[in-house]
Amino acid sequence: MSEQIVTSEIITPVVPDKNGKINLLDLNRQQMREFFKELGEKPFRADQVMKWMYHYCSDNFDEMTDINKVLRGKLKEVAEIRAPEVVEEQRSSDGTIKWAIAVGDQRVETVYIPEDDRATLCVSSQVGCALECKFCSTAQQGFNRNLRVSEIIGQVWRAAKIVGAAKVTGQRPITNVVMMGMGEPLLNLTNVVPAMEIMLDDFGFGLSKRRVTLSTSGVVPALDKLGDMIDVALAISLHAPNDEIRDEIVPINRKYNIETFLDAVRRYLQKSNANQGRVTIEYVMLDHINDGTEHAHQLAELLKDTPCKINLIPWNPFPGAPYGRSSNSRIDRFSKVLMSYGFTTIVRKTRGDDIDAACGQLAGDVIDRTKRTLRKRMQGEAIDIKAV
């Protein structure tokens, strides 16, 4: 086996859980080897345990039969393998599965999307989101905290456990992971990067770097750091052809405008092999907001110096949202303009919208620390009083 191992400089502090045990899902391979060294064991023991954890989805040390009984007993005293639990499952008519995952006293959502030739898992990185993109349900829930490594990789582990571990079924239960669930991944680099390293590691889930995708709304300093830490596929949530529109629907644009964002994207592409020289542009289609043919021409001009493919995403509604979904005819005209400029343009097929599992619909259960939901409720009450 050709080893793919941790290369980043991030070392997340390993903190025992309340029961005093180390959750091994919090450790990448470098940390696992250090942990076993502290136990007086050889580094290869870490590799053996990781193989059981991720290839077999085992959380029981007694199942690890190539490890001696004394070491298994020692591990049970000081460590555990504890992934977050599924507390609710919903299945779509198209085969998509949405899991509500308990993280402490809150919930995040994880989505499994099976297709004929692949199975993609959409993973959350935060409880809620601080960025307030106006068309996204998650953003309306407010923000509470970053997820730990074990809570991020634990979503992949739990999904693989449910669908069937690779060594049990003989097939990969998950072929692609997209960091496109709840939260902005670049605002949680300390935990997201080690989790992605486990996804890529041969003794982890062994995914190709082209099959692990991080999506960002444009936290430019963190994007520059990412390029020095790990090489994964990159998707960017652009959603507008100019700063005027993006300032309104993606507020972080007021801090890092489109030009600044795309400059950072091009810097990342220069460092990356995973992207095959181009980035994926995500563009949600909002009726009569950003979906006119004039917007398509502006977008083509904007992206002329950025190697990319463009995903057009029909907007998925949620209660209280002030937008409408673009009609098929408007999306078609928009797409044809982009293709006339030579851009690879794909209209994303909506999956799981009947269970609110589609793009922009994930909500979870968030104890909002930003007071955003309270402000919105008070504003709503004020409007109602005025209307009366």
UniProtKB/Swiss-Prot annotation:
This enzyme's EC code(s): 2.1.1.192
Stored Pfam families: Radical_SAM (PF04055), RlmN_N (PF21016)
SUPFAM superfamilies in the record: Radical SAM enzymes
Location relative to the cell: Cytoplasm
Coiled coil: none
Cofactor or coenzyme needed: [4Fe-4S] cluster
Radical SAM core domain residues: 115-354
GO molecular function annotations of the record: 4 iron, 4 sulfur cluster binding; metal ion binding; rRNA (adenine(2503)-C2-)-methyltransferase activity; rRNA binding; tRNA (adenine(37)-C2)-methyltransferase activity; tRNA binding
GO biological process: one example: tRNA methylation
Binding residues annotated for [4Fe-4S] cluster, in chain numbering: 129, 133, 136
Cofactor binding note from Swiss-Prot or TrEMBL: Binds 1 [4Fe-4S] cluster. The cluster is coordinated with 3 cysteines and an exchangeable S-adenosyl-L-methionine.
Family annotation (InterPro entries): Aldolase_TIM, Methyltransferase_A, RlmN_N, RNA_MTrfase_RlmN, rRNA_lsu_MTrfase_RlmN/Cfr, rSAM
Cellular component annotations (GO), alphabetically ordered: cytoplasm
Leftover remarks: Reaction proceeds by a ping-pong mechanism involving intermediate methylation of a conserved cysteine residue.
Protein name: Dual-specificity RNA methyltransferase RlmN
Source species of the chain: Citrobacter koseri (strain ATCC BAA-895 / CDC 4225-83 / SGSC4696)
Gene: rlmN
